[in-house]
Amino acid sequence: MSAPATRDMRTSAPGVFMAVLWRDIFVTGRELPVFLAQVILQPLFMLFVFGKVLSNLGYTRPGYAHLLFPGIVALTALLTSLQSTALPLVLEFSFTKEIEDRLLAPIPTALVAVEKMIFAAMRALIAAVCMFPIGILILGSVPWRAAGAPEFVVILILGVLAGSAMGLTMGTLVPPNRISIAFSLVLTPLLFTGCSQYPWPTLDSLRWFQIVTLFNPLTYVSEGMRGALVPYVPHMRAWVCVAALVFWLAAFSAIGIWGFIRRAID
């Protein structure tokens, strides 16, 4: 290939990348009510039952709803990005074959995988932000600190990207006929060992379980958001959460992109 042709391809790659991303955003915009119903229903009921019903019945301590809310936002962000990457990839690689159109685009295969991650992360950002008006509607108020906004934004972005990287890994490495089993084996432990319902430092009396939670990326999203929104509650240090999320993001991205390229070649 000549030098000018190579330069043209490099110049056009960002434009093609943005065009593919915009196409996905446009499709989601047309189906926004359905998308929101899919991703918000579960955290909405968790917030309602654990934050409102149990509180009104006296089964939780006063203020538990404000402790719970950052964890529910974290759960919504990470699970939405994970599912928004994994499930479409399984369908596109095995049934609809829609991924073949993307692979024909004049951009590196790795960038197609990155586009999938970024698009899923954007969907997760929308879902996480929507939890604030829902929280106000259900709880009457939600914790928010202007001083904690930068930390919250950093943790949120790292959390949705880590979740989409996890989804990329699952969607490319798990066989299509095993994806439902994989989700059953992954999502339930992810949900209950991610410190979304309880602060990590309070698990001192259950040391073995406290150690187990460290292997769940959701733990660091929950703790980081808790530190940003309700700093008076025991929580991990912000730098620990950021460092851990960067590690999980890098690890799952490397594995997921490798798996994506392998599936694309096959």
Language-model features: locations:
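Aromatic- and glycine-rich beta-strand/loop motifs that create alpha-glucan
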Residues: 2-42
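Junction motif at the cytosolic side of a transmembrane helix
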Residues: 2-7, 229-233, 243-266
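Short alpha-helical transmembrane interface motifs in multi-pass membrane proteins
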Residues: 7, 31-35, 67-71, 79-83, ...
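Short, hydrophobic transmembrane alpha-helix segments
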Residues: 29, 33, 52-62
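Hydrophobic alpha-helical transmembrane segments of multi-pass membrane transport proteins
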Residues: 45-50, 65-138, 185-186, 191
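Transmembrane helix segments
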Residues: 54, 171-215
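Alpha-helical transmembrane segments and their short interhelical loops
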Residues: 109, 113-185, 235-257
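Membrane-interfacial helix-loop-helix junctions in multi-pass membrane proteins
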Residues: 142-143, 195-251
